[in-house]
Amino acid sequence: MKSTVEQAMLFEEKSIFENQAIEQGYSRVAGVDEAGRGPLAGPVVAGACILPRGKVFLGIDDSKKLTPKQRRYLYELLLEDPEVDCGVGVVSVERIDEINILEATKEAMVQAIASLQSTPDFLLVDGLFLPHKVPSLKIIKGDARSVSIAAASIIAKEYRDELMRKLHVEYPEYGFDKHKGYGTAAHLQALKHFGPCVYHRKSFSPVKESIQEGVCQ
């Protein structure tokens, strides 16, 4: 585990894009990221986050690099801090099937930005060019390079995981609480046995194939 000093230095290193935007005259820089582009089931969720200038949040990193315990702690820390502005966007399975996952992801991001309490004047977006009235910068692997995007990734991931746990209560046979809709061996086996439920993405290949094979509920 990194020391407090090392974590503070890492936070500063990953603030380079935010600092550059501020030097250019922007003041409300929002990081934007998504969770759930790849799963076979469940919505796609986006997070947006504006971190206060001059405040260090130790441990902020790409949500995929954090343990569930670390991620949950940081999620609650961000939501409970009155100086942090967080927003969430959720796009349903039906909408994903209607417009495709890429466009649905962009739609979720726009929703997340709109749900912020204050309007950002610059966006740092993980991996996507996002058509938006607010100027933006696409950052490849931004969740590992920008603290704002990393914070947004934590918000999106935790929020979506909570949604998938709720879906598990409705359809426990699929194990949504464990794999969160991703195409694990156990999920594919359940899909083969039970067929897809209403929360499966029918435009995604394994689900589409199970429907064509006639195992749809």
Swiss-Prot record:
Domain RNase H type-2: 27-216
SUPFAM superfamilies tied to this protein: Ribonuclease H-like
Matching PROSITE patterns: RNASE_H_2
Cofactor: Mn(2+); Mg(2+)
Record's keyword terms, sorted: Cytoplasm, Endonuclease, Hydrolase, Manganese, Metal-binding, Nuclease
Free-text comment on the cofactor: Manganese or magnesium. Binds 1 divalent metal ion per monomer in the absence of substrate. May bind a second metal ion after substrate binding.
Localization of this protein: Cytoplasm
Keyword Cytoplasm on entry: yes
Broad class of where this protein is predominantly found: cytoplasm
Residues bound to a divalent metal cation: 33-34, 126
GO molecular function terms noted in the UniProt entry: manganese ion binding; RNA binding; RNA-DNA hybrid ribonuclease activity
GO biological process per UniProt: DNA replication, removal of RNA primer; mismatch repair
Statement: the UniProt record of this protein carries the keyword Nucleotide-binding: no
Family annotation (Pfam families): RNase_HII
GO cellular component, one term: ribonuclease H2 complex
Catalytic reaction list: Endonucleolytic cleavage to 5'-phosphomonoester
Family, as annotated: Belongs to the RNase HII family.
NCBIfam families named among the record's database cross-references: PRK00015.1-1 (NF000594), PRK00015.1-3 (NF000595)
Protein function: Endonuclease that specifically degrades the RNA of RNA-DNA hybrids.
Protein name: Ribonuclease HII
Native source organism of the sequence: Chlamydia trachomatis serovar A (strain ATCC VR-571B / DSM 19440 / HAR-13)
